Amino acid sequence: MNKKSKKMLVAILLGFLLVTTIYNNWRLNEMAGSNPGILNVGFDVDDTILFSRDVFLNIPEDKRNPTDYGWVNMQDEKLSLFIEPTVELIKYFKNNGHNVFLITARSGENGDYLAKFLSDGLGSDITKDENLFFCPKESINGVRYTTKHYQMKKLNLNLFYGDADTDMIAALKANVHPVRIVRHNESIEQYGNNYFGNVKDGEKEKNPFQMNDLKIFYSKSVGIYGESI
């Protein structure tokens, strides 16, 4: 190969490398959204932001089957408490310029009451259908399944914090990294059908783990679905 051909080959290779680099940078920016370095972070509400056990334990009998979420969404001011470490985490993300979205399995009747309560407690504007989304479970052949993954995909989330197995599953289905918020012991004891969390109901197919098992998971900071804890 003569000197001129070598120079031409080098020029072609450099041009190809430049185009490839530009394309890869464009793809990275596309994956990160319009603001590279800015995360889209999602949070569940019940037992993640709010200790809302007393709301659900006090549902009147005539509003239980099916659950009257119009009633539930109006009770948080009286019966729910904010989980302060989660509140501080949300403030950290927002103060550092990240986008925060809240996704709940409650249905949206009277959802503005919940939005106002969350706004007051988090110190930032929470608005239904803007950064607070209601994604009730879908019933198929009598079994209720999460629908949160649809909203997670729309929001292009990077992280999702939740307490329930269904939160972890929804995040994985949406290709979002799941982070487990460990439920308060009183919540574990009173309600919830987590494979991970139900350790006080005996050894059953739906409750395969005991408290010692959970302590091992906690010590490793990894849950049964590979989620962070």
Question: For the regions a protein language model found, what residue spans apply to each?
Answer:
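Extended aliphatic helical segments
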Residues: 10, 19, 41, 45, ...
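C-terminal cap/substrate-recognition subdomain and adjoining C-terminal extension
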Residues: 98, 107-229
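Alpha-helical substrate-recognition element adjacent to the catalytic core
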Residues: 26-139
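Non-catalytic pre-domain segments flanking phosphatase-related domains
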Residues: 2-45, 200, 205-229
